[in-house]
Amino acid sequence: MLLGSHVSMSGKEMLLGSSKEALSYGANTFMIYTGAPQNTRRKAIADLNIMNGRLHMKEHGMTNIVVHAPYIINIGNTEKPETFRLGVDFLQSEIERTAALEATQIVLHPGAHVGAGADAGIAKIIEGLNEVLSQDYPVQIALETMAGKGTECGRSFEELAKIIDGVTHNERLSVCFDTCHTHDAGYNIVEDFDGVLNEFDKLIGVDRIKVLHINDSKNVRGAAKDRHENIGFGHIGFDALNYVVHHPQLMAIPKILETPFVPLASDAKSKSAPYKAEIEMLRSSTFKPELIEALKG
């Protein structure tokens, strides 16, 4: 089973540091941003320490790593041409960096229509993806299932299907299935994950799922809020998430935790990563809330 988390990529070690961090959590895969998700400042590809990072990954069985595109990309924006243009150009450069890292999946929030309506936003996303995918790289864009917060597009399987169907080179598109987002969008993954997966299969095809984001949710189903919670501590719950992680149709897919860091009881500003504990729980199929509580000190 491929199970890991979001890790940082920074400093001099860059990819090597990412692999070391993932190893410390007991992971065998991981997800990274190639720089800060809030801006376009990026180190040169030559400074990502790729060779040493890949060597460490090989030595420790790290495979199927995933890149996440930055939040600032919004190719669904019909109101500001400069925002759309930045999104297309920067996504193309991020795909180039993803290929250099030898990752095959870059996760993308499809975009927000900023008031123009979902149909207009989806049309703009299709336009942007058609331009981005005109350049050939061995990388798929994994469109993420969204919670429906604000004017997000991709809040339903139907919206994602419409985007995929409209893109010319849609063999270069995949899907990142986020448990928190899907739950918050209204899908009953707690009581009927197989039914949800069957619905996805009919509209898009389960074979399109190439990344799973495994997150609990702070919100009730259908809240359209997108607030992640630690595994077993939210409205989805451990049993449902454990079922997803061990689902026979999804075994070969990298599963990435994006759960919140745990604040210390003595100092809320100091926080600990929960990933080692959560990976241990999911690998053993045993909910151990005391592991998370222990992180509070």
Curated annotation (Swiss-Prot):
NCBIfam families: nfo, PRK01060.1-1. One of its GO terms (molecular function) is zinc ion binding. Its cofactor is Zn(2+). Zn(2+) 3 binds at H181, D226, H228. Endonuclease IV plays a role in DNA repair. It cleaves phosphodiester bonds at apurinic or apyrimidinic (AP) sites, generating a 3'-hydroxyl group and a 5'-terminal sugar phosphate. The gene is nfo. Pfam families: AP_endonuc_2 (PF01261). It comes from Lysinibacillus sphaericus (strain C3-41). Keywords: DNA damage, DNA repair, Endonuclease, Hydrolase, Metal-binding, Nuclease, Zinc. One of its GO terms (biological process) is base-excision repair. Binds 3 Zn(2+) ions. This is Probable endonuclease 4. InterPro entries: AP_endonuc_2, AP_endonuc_F2_Zn_BS, Xyl_isomerase-like_sf, Xyl_isomerase-like_TIM-brl. CDD domains: AP2Ec (cd00019). Its EC number is 3.1.21.2. Belongs to the AP endonuclease 2 family. Zn(2+) 2 binds at E144, D178, H213, E258. It comes from the Bacteria. Zn(2+) 1 binds at H68, H109, E144. It is an enzyme of class 3 (hydrolase). It catalyses: Endonucleolytic cleavage to 5'-phosphooligonucleotide end-products.
